[in-house]
């Protein structure tokens, strides 16, 4: 693929560079700085609001939905330039922009679009993905979490796992089984769920690093109003495909290894800095190569759409 900018793309890149130079530094995280979860979320929301005010939130989202109405290549350009700064961009923001908004925009009602889209673009709402289960990961259609209709609500029981940042999310996108008597792909229904709903128990999973980015999420008699169903009954698989397309296109994170290299270069060691250590250099070089491969794959996927 051709990585050279067209005349129009070069002009957009120059515009983005100038805007980022004026607005990104005050939001940037210093190399080696460790933030609490609460600070990460607060700063991530503030940076998202800055982008919204500047017209860079939801670059590919149609203007009718409050986005910029730009091209996928413009989104790639912005990501590349934004990646030059160490900014607070966690999954609690990315899931909303890259997964929740596409499915709500494509399958949601006008009322759902009005309720969720602008607030998410502004960084006022954070999101998690409630898909994977202990016995349904790669085989997503095998989910067992059940939803049964009761009046104007659906009552949900089940368990989800590996829910990134669910413990700090306002809303979740949820796929459940509503009809166990049909082919598994056809018995699914899609909801958005308020993570503060009674019956939701989010349990952080402690990682070896000490952080807790992932969670187990238990749903016990959780009542979800039918107005929070996305699409119709049995249309959950189509909604999932919309979400997963957005997820695949959002893979790759620019600038993380460069930031780590800068930190290593500034961190003293027994002789020189950490970056002078051959084993550190090798580890960073390996990580950089993997990051670049992932970024090139992302660019290829985006330009194939």
Language-model region placement:
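Amphipathic, small/basic residue-rich leader segments at the start of a protein or domain
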Residues: 1-94, 115, 119-122, 250, ...
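Glycine-rich beta->alpha junctions and the first turn(s) of the following alpha-helix
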Residues: 3, 200-297, 304
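Buried hydrophobic positions in well-ordered alpha/beta secondary-structure cores of metabolic enzymes
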Residues: 9, 20, 55, 62, ...
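Short Ser/Thr-interspersed hydrophobic loop/turn segments at strand-loop and sheet-helix junctions
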Residues: 55, 78-83, 175-176, 192-197, ...
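N-terminal glycine-rich flavin-associated loop
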Residues: 91-111, 137
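Short Gly/Pro-enriched turn/cap motifs at secondary-structure boundaries
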Residues: 93, 135-138, 162-165, 180-182, ...
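A short, Trp-centered hydrophobic/proline-enriched beta-strand micro-motif
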Residues: 123-131, 175
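A short core secondary-structure module
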Residues: 144, 152-153, 157-203
């Amino acid at each position: 693929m051709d990585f050279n900018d067209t005349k129009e793309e070069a002009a957009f890149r120059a515009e983005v560079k100038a805007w980022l130079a004026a607005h990104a530094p005050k939001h940037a995280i210093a190399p080696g700085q460790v933030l609490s979860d609460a600070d990460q979320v607060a700063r991530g929301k503030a940076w998202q609001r800055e982008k919204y005010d500047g017209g860079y939130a939801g670059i590919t989202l149609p203007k009718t939905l409050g986005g910029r109405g730009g091209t996928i290549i413009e989104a790639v350009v912005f990501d590349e330039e934004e990646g030059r700064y160490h900014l607070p961009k966690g999954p609690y923001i990315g899931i909303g922009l890259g997964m929740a908004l596409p499915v709500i925009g494509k399958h949601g009602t006008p009322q759902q679009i009005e309720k969720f889209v602008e607030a998410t673009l502004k960084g006022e709402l954070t999101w998690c993905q409630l898909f994977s289960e202990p016995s349904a990961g790669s085989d997503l259609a095998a989910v067992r979490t059940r939803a049964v209709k009761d009046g104007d609500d659906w009552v949900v029981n089940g368990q989800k796992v590996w829910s990134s940042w669910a413990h700090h999310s306002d809303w979740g996108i949820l796929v459940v089984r509503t009809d166990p008597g049909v082919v598994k792909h056809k018995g699914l229904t899609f909801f958005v769920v308020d993570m503060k709903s009674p019956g939701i128990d989010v349990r952080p999973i402690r990682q070896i690093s000490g952080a807790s980015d992932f969670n187990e999420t238990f749903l016990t008699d959780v009542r979800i109003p039918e107005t929070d169903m996305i699409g119709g009954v049995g249309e959950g698989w189509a909604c999932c495909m919309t979400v997963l397309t957005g997820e695949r296109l959002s893979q790759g994170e620019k600038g993380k290894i460069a930031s780590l290299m800068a930190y290593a270069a500034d961190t003293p060691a027994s002789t020189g800095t950490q970056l002078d250590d051959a084993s550190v250099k090798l580890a960073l070089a390996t990580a950089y190569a993997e990051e670049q491969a992932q970024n090139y794959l992302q660019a290829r996927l985006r330009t194939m759409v």
